[in-house]
A protein has these predicted regions:
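A charged N-terminal "starter" segment
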Residues: 1-127, 164, 168, 172-176, ...
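Flexible, glycine/proline-enriched loop segments at strand-loop-helix junctions
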Residues: 10, 101-107, 147-158, 186-192
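Short beta-strand segments
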Residues: 42, 128-134, 181-183, 216-218
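Active-site-proximal loop/turn and secondary-structure-junction residues that shape catalytic pockets
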Residues: 45-47, 68-69, 89-91, 109-111, ...
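Short acidic, glycine/serine/threonine-rich loops at helix termini
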Residues: 52, 75, 95-97, 116-119, ...
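Phosphate/diphosphate-binding glycine-rich loops and adjacent basic-rich segments that engage nucleotide
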Residues: 131-158, 167
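Metal-dependent enolase-superfamily TIM-barrel catalytic cores that perform enediolate-based chemistry
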Residues: 151-171, 187, 193-201
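C-terminal active-site-proximal or functional interface alpha/beta core segments in diverse enzymes
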Residues: 186-268
Length: 268
């Protein structure tokens, strides 16, 4: 810290002991309930190359939300099959490259569904595709959602039937659906948010009789904050709800922490 105060430029000051403790806690908490659970570090939280390389060394995947972040992950040594590609800002070229090379790609729009038809047919059969689910979080957690009663900005709405149409599109074009992505932004980061996410995942799996490889519950957790839910609290709750559905007994989980694994360990 003393050396940091001597610098004549803004900088990040990283307490590696705190960051390591938070990362290890996240890993152990996920693996307690899903031995092969996937943890993707959210690049948008802080994409400082040292931090990304550190997360890679710890075994965390890259969670990216733009073509620039996708390219950064590759430049920093991530193999394409250890990247999770989310969000509506995917470029077409990077999207197709990701789909054809084993990246977990969570489809966010009808435009991306159409892009799938331009992918190599044989490679598409081996792809790992999820659908971003948009549901009314406010109905489950009044006063806790960022959007209130308005529709979220991302993904396919369950309530309007857009999700059903996306599922039908995949079935009609013989595109295998590997997963669902249900990240929700909230005001509270409460356990109720993840209870809702898990319950909606179960509801969709039952309604459409889906056999999925993964459910991506996103990020937004507290981390290293006293008197707030721990990683174990979140993941145990989700696991208990998933355990009520036989169709999910062989389904893996993806979590995407960002601030929860670095926030307490970084100063400026």
């Amino acid at each position: 810290m003393e050396k940091g105060h001597m610098l004549n430029t803004p900088c990040f000051v990283i307490n590696t002991e705190i960051v390591e403790s938070l990362v290890e806690d996240a890993i152990l908490s996920v693996r307690k309930f899903w031995p092969n659970g996937i943890i993707g570090y959210s690049f948008k939280t802080n994409n400082l190359p040292w931090i990304i390389s550190y997360m890679k060394e710890k075994g965390l995947w890259a969670e990216v939300v733009s073509s620039d972040e996708f390219q950064l992950a590759k430049e920093l040594g991530y193999s394409l099959n250890r990247i999770i590609f989310n969000g509506p800002a995917k470029g077409k070229m990077e999207f197709i490259e990701a789909v054809e090379n084993g990246t977990i790609v969570n489809i966010d729009s009808k435009r991306e569904l159409k892009w799938l038809l331009e992918c190599d047919a044989e490679k598409l059969k081996k792809s790992k595709l999820g659908l971003r689910v948009n549901f009314c979080l406010e109905e489950y957690c009044p006063g806790e959602s960022q959007c209130g009663n308005e529709d979220g900005r991302f993904g396919f709405s369950y309530e309007t039937g857009d999700l059903a149409q996306a599922i039908d599109f995949c079935h009609n074009h013989n595109i295998h659906l590997s997963g669902l992505h249900l990240h929700c932004s909230s005001k509270t980061r409460s356990l109720n948010i993840y209870k809702a996410i898990a319950e909606v995942a179960v509801k969709i799996v039952r309604e459409y009789n889906l056999q999925l490889q993964f459910v991506d519950v996103g990020g937004g957790y507290f981390g290293g904050v006293s008197d707030k839910p721990s990683f174990r609290n979140y993941f145990e709750l989700i696991h208990n709800i998933f355990s009520t559905e036989k169709l999910l007994e062989n389904t893996n989980i993806i979590v995407e922490p960002g601030m929860s694994v670095i926030g307490a360990g970084i100063d400026y």
